[in-house]
Amino acid sequence: MAAAAPSPSSSAFSKTLSPSSSTSSTLLPRSTFPFPHHPHKTTPPPLHLTHTHIHIHSQRRRFTISNVISTNQKVSQTEKTETFVSRFAPDEPRKGSDVLVEALEREGVTDVFAYPGGASMEIHQALTRSSIIRNVLPRHEQGGVFAAEGYARATGFPGVCIATSGPGATNLVSGLADALLDSVPIVAITGQVPRRMIGTDAFQETPIVEVTRSITKHNYLVMDVEDIPRVVREAFFLARSGRPGPILIDVPKDIQQQLVIPDWDQPMRLPGYMSRLPKLPNEMLLEQIVRLISESKKPVLYVGGGCSQSSEDLRRFVELTGIPVASTLMGLGAFPTGDELSLSMLGMHGTVYANYAVDSSDLLLAFGVRFDDRVTGKLEAFASRAKIVHIDIDSAEIGKNKQPHVSICADIKLALQGLNSILESKEGKLKLDFSAWRQELTEQKVKHPLNFKTFGDAIPPQYAIQVLDELTNGNAIISTGVGQHQMWAAQYYKYRKPRQWLTSGGLGAMGFGLPAAIGAAVGRPDEVVVDIDGDGSFIMNVQELATIKVENLPVKIMLLNNQHLGMVVQWEDRFYKANRAHTYLGNPSNEAEIFPNMLKFAEACGVPAARVTHRDDLRAAIQKMLDTPGPYLLDVIVPHQEHVLPMIPSGGAFKDVITEGDGRSSY
């Protein structure tokens, strides 16, 4: 998307201090509009927020739970640690763009991912005047929003991305939808045409508030420069409270240019939202859950991304009960994968023993999950023998797909702390003993381990991830694109802790891996960050190689290159008699050639790169990748016939699980 020149008609400053200003409230509306209550209702709401559409977006996958908000909790990160010192005098007028940047500073923002254009260049000019905020310049706005997501997923603090109006703003759409589905706290700021041009089909005008209404937790169109401090404060509060999600702030260019003396003490206007935040968990219900545990013989924990802030409390709960743990794709890392009580991932490509455990259980403890179709398969058959306990921060998720016997709408962390307190008070009295159940599951682990075959000196993709796990001691931050490589990374890397695993779960957005790794490397510069990617996903945002080079980010890219859209090929093999329908990404006129040459992309951006084709050379090649300072790309050539197994077909049940076969067989 080419950056556009500014509109010549919007270059003069507008002063809100002067009643004679051409943009005074007598000529233009001064209200900042939040979105309507519901995307299917056209009646506009009051000008203050009374409701967020938590109940609307029922298909979201968990990213994290939030802190429960109390009256004495500080909203701003900087307020928690030190008094903010402005570079402006208290009564000094400044541009709206400077107010916006200072508002970000006051929220503790130190990094943004921003791509300039005509409608946002005032914000970029203000960023150059900030000594606090660093802009990491992506090479595409989608790269910027995915990087903001990676930052948020890796750090827990809202990621910030900025784009211009029109195509710049619409390039954020996939990232906003992804953040909503995975409950990731990000704040996206877009430039907009001047207020007087809104609705005139002006150059690069897009009604981005309308476009993103159904894929954001909340959004704003700022129509009064004096609203900026409040709007930014609310945006960060909304992004990380309750069920986290993306917030969009659309700022017209004339608002950015107006002079104003900001009021930093404006209160937030969120009465409806505040009243809907989850309350403390009901103690009687917690006691009932403990009683169900004591009465069960085959309990299983089913944990999701909602547990990512509660890892220590979850571990303590498992220690007190001895209940085995199965994780969703988004929940990986909440409980150590290598622990003897871990069943690893369940669902479509989960382990046989995790799915066996859920299928055989008499009590399913579903914490921070949404009973997604990729986990449950056929709903009627999922955990059909079990009583179900569902704890979630979002009331809309409870009973949406699977009706629980006991449910609590609460912060998972507080619920776990309450359960642990009850269990500790009863220690020695409950006499929980699930050893026979654990032994049954251990036998399933022995009988149905994750495994793969080797063919000559070809490199099995699963083996590449195993070696990476060994060489990093399972401590790297891993990002992925979407496809087979994503599932193998979920299966074969042993995640030790939360915020190690960055992947597009609910939306399944290809091109996510490299930008997300950029965000993680910016937010956690002392960690090893590896993008495990597929050739199809990688090339969708390959331009971000320039970003990691220019920023000297030590992002390692391990590319599992089979020159195919591997997951679609797998389905073609299984369900379409191996008929190839545009899934070959190489050069049909020369199939012996590795095409495109990923090493040339890296070379063009000055990123060191190497290719490995033989299994015996793989370990040394990965070690060199890890040892090389700065960014590095390792092109690992793998067979396209490999299938991700186990596999429960879409809409199937545990009895339908597939454990054998690949593209070398016919079906």
UniProtKB/Swiss-Prot annotation:
Residues 484-564 are annotated as: Thiamine pyrophosphate binding. Its EC number is 2.2.1.6. Residues 1-94 form a transit peptide. InterPro entries: Acetolactate_synth_lsu, AHAS_TPP, DHS-like_NAD/FAD-binding_dom, THDP-binding, Thiamin_PyroP_enz_cen_dom, Thiamin_PyroP_enz_TPP-bd_dom, TPP-bd_CS, TPP_enz. It is an enzyme of class 2 (transferase). PROSITE patterns: TPP_ENZYMES. It is found in: Plastid, Chloroplast. Binds 1 Mg(2+) ion per subunit. Binds 1 thiamine pyrophosphate per subunit. Disulfide bonds join 161-307. FAD binds at residues 243, 349-370, 392-411. Its main location: plastid. SUPFAM superfamilies: DHS-like NAD/FAD-binding domain (SSF52467), Thiamin diphosphate-binding fold (THDP-binding) (SSF52518). The keyword Heme does not apply. There are two distinct ALS genes in tobacco. The enzyme shown here is derived from the ALS gene on locus SuRA. Acetolactate synthase is the target enzyme for sulfonylurea and imidazolinone herbicides. This is Acetolactate synthase 1, chloroplastic. It comes from Nicotiana tabacum. The gene is ALS SURA.
